[in-house]
Amino acid sequence: MITINTYALQKRRTFAIISHPDAGKTTLTEKFLLNGKIIRTSGTIKARRSKKYAKSDWMEIEKKKGISITTSVIQIPYNRYLINILDTPGHQDFSEDTYRVLTAVDFCVMIVDAAKGVEERTRKLIHVARTHRTPIITFINKLDRNSLDPIEILDQLEIELKIKCSPIIWPISCGKAFKGIYHIYNNLVYFYSYKTSEGINDTNNFLLKTCCLNDVFLDKIIGLELAQEFREEVELVNSIYKAFNKRIFLESDLTPIFFGSALKNFGVNFLMQGILDWAPSPVFKKSNIRKVQPYEKNFSGFVFKIQANMDLRHRDRMAFIRIVSGKYRKRMKLYHVRIKKYIIQTEVFSFVAGDRFIIETAYPGDIIGFHSYNSIKIGDTFTEGEKLKFFGIPNFAPELFRLVSLVDPFHKKKLLKGLTQLSEEGAIQVFKPYENNELILGAIGSLQFDIVIERLKIEYNIFILVHKVNIFSIRWISSNSLDTLSTFKNQNKSCLALDINNHLVYLASSEINLRLVQSRYPDIIFNVTCEN
């Protein structure tokens, strides 16, 4: 007999949407909200003049700049399932947030712009996802615009991303000639209409006109010549691409391919049904002790994200926790493993972008949030008492650095608080040099500095300037010998700093400097990442 807990597990799907910027990530997320009847119209980025913003872009800065800069957590009920979506920033300057999110999901939906094919950001994200053996479902978007040949796109996926493709949906032409899609597994053609209004749930309108591949109705709708060409193309596709195999997909070696237009909500319903039918329910996560299975009785979960000032009126900080095992119950006692203390949260939330809802129960796969007291950090584990720690939530060595100066020097204490909170949520990295009181910011991309300056101004009323500093890169320092580490510290004080978690860091002024110090101290470990 299936228990309530097992049933709850089977009915959950937790995934990240990943893509290159402007491939349609936020638009697709909103169509999920639309189809799940969470919203009635979508506020697309281009509608900013009418004060309609993307629902998943909830921060003021996101609305102002028209881009996603932080991961949005969204829970949607759909066809008796509960879908947990993490809509990640597409911009490469916010890649750290995306990398952390990949540790909290069970699979990914990858969006590919049909006009551009595989892009640089996509390559990097898929490399990380496949390193974790994360299953990938592919949605090729914007078929109603000028696009590459579908077979060319699939060739790019197979060659550049080294993953086998299995088409579920196949398009009838593309761009201005786009006529619709064919579902290979139910043998039905669905016709496309350019009259469809964006932002309205028109799924049913598409389904009114359907026919089988060999139906004469297809010849009448798209023309005999095109219909015959399309039938031959489908025959070719079926002969050269692998049939869908769920086992190979779950091993991350095969990706099912869906085509459509997220903006027009065309083909999105088939993607959503594929997620329900084939994507994994919550899976195990590795800890320092063992694999933790989702069906275990006792609660466990880890913090993969902290967001400061979700509610500016209350200056709150929200910790986002992926539940790995057990069941969360209202006011249950949780053990904060790192600080060795029990806590009881009076309010625990689920999310739809910037909106939050108090919940009383939650299961593995769910993303819950609670108000974060200052001792909660990214990577922290919560259990019912077991002393374990989940792996895989690192900080990466920044690529750009800036020195901070205050417009008003009397706000130093306030600045430290603001930067500490922003660094704890992963918006920026902060380093404090050994030999002075300066503060150095580290980022993956320059836009991160702009965002931090803006958020300090809006959320903390602090005004800062940033200046270039002579730092090429940083490495986190460790050694198996305390004496060796002590000697290294004494001899290199001017090049050392502490990060926000008081981990020792070496500040390299150049690539040559880094190579020299590494060769001079062979017993010192220079780490590119640091586990939270």
From Swiss-Prot:
CDD domains: RF3. The keyword Transport does not apply. The keyword tRNA-binding does not apply. Pfam families: EF-G_D2 (PF22042), GTP_EFTU (PF00009), RF3_C (PF16658). GO terms for biological process: regulation of translational termination. It is found in: Cytoplasm. Increases the formation of ribosomal termination complexes and stimulates activities of RF-1 and RF-2. It binds guanine nucleotides and has strong preference for UGA stop codons. It may interact directly with the ribosome. The stimulation of RF-1 and RF-2 is significantly reduced by GTP and GDP, but not by GMP. This is Peptide chain release factor 3. The gene is prfC.
